[in-house]
């Protein structure tokens, strides 16, 4: 009986993200190429280690490698495109007093940054 339950659980988890599904960033209007440029412009790498971004080797914030595989954003929000954009635009509103500064990103800029982060697997 335990093996049956374990098998069904693994099938349910495996079915959560269908093979061949479009990357998350394609579904919400972000562009990872623009996101990469925005990450550089906003100097996100001063605080974060970000794969693929030159000189992004900061140690203040968490490293952002494999971001697409995380279950939460900043440990407090579900890792969905909408929640990530919200966090990128207003981190102090989400968690007042945290180390992430308000970025001043527009909605489109935040979508682009999110699109780049979702390429990190």
Predicted segments with their positions:
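Bacterial N-terminal signal peptides that target proteins for export
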Residues: 1-4
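Disulfide-bonded cysteine motifs in exported proteins
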Residues: 11, 39-42
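Electrostatic cytochrome c docking/interface patches
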Residues: 17-40
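Cys/His-rich metal-chelating microdomains
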Residues: 19, 50-51
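Extracytoplasmic electron-transfer domains, predominantly the class I c-type cytochrome c fold
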Residues: 30, 37, 55-121
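Short cysteine clusters
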Residues: 44-47
């Amino acid at each position: 009986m335990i093996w049956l339950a374990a098998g069904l659980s693994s099938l349910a988890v495996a079915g959560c993200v269908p093979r061949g599904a479009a990357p998350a960033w394609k579904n919400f209007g972000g562009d990872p190429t623009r996101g990469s440029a925005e990450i550089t412009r906003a100097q996100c790498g001063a605080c974060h280690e970000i794969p693929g971004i030159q000189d992004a080797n900061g140690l203040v914030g968490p490293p952002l490698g494999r971001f697409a595989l995380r279950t939460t954003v900043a440990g407090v929000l579900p890792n969905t495109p909408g929640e990530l954009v919200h966090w990128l635009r207003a981190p102090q509103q989400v968690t007042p007093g945290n180390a992430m500064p308000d970025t001043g990103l527009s909605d489109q800029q935040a979508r682009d940054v999110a699109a780049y982060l979702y390429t990190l697997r």
